[in-house]
A protein has these predicted regions:
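Short Lys/Arg-rich basic patches
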Residues: 1-16
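Membrane-interacting alpha-helical segments
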Residues: 4, 47-48
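Amphipathic, hydrophobic secondary-structure cores in small proteins
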Residues: 14, 20, 31-45
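Amphipathic alpha-helical recognition patches that constitute DNA-binding helices
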Residues: 16, 35, 52, 56
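Aromatic/hydrophobic pocket-lining residues that form π-stacking "cages" and hydrophobic walls in ligand
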Residues: 25
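C-terminal structural segments of small proteins and small subunits
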Residues: 48-70
Length: 70
């Protein structure tokens, strides 16, 4: 499990993700020529405010994997 801190809307937020999910998040950031923080910011801006950000990140990664498997 890896814990990272990012700034979202001017507030520091900690996110816990399994190492495998964090590795994939870094991979997608590199492929997209952006930062992990930018991907997390985009996910945060588009999520239901009542949902858990770490869970939303996992779902986003799963959707990316499903896109590439088609």
């Amino acid at each position: 499990m890896k814990k990272i801190s990012v700034s979202l809307s001017g507030h520091q937020t900690s996110i816990s993700l399994e190492n495998e999910f964090f590795d994939l998040l870094k991979k997608y950031a590199t492929e997209s020529k952006t930062s992990v923080a930018n991907i997390i910011k985009t996910i945060d801006e588009n999520r239901n405010p009542n949902s858990n950000l770490s869970s939303e990140i996992r779902i986003w990664i799963l959707k990316q994997l499903l896109k590439t498997s088609k």
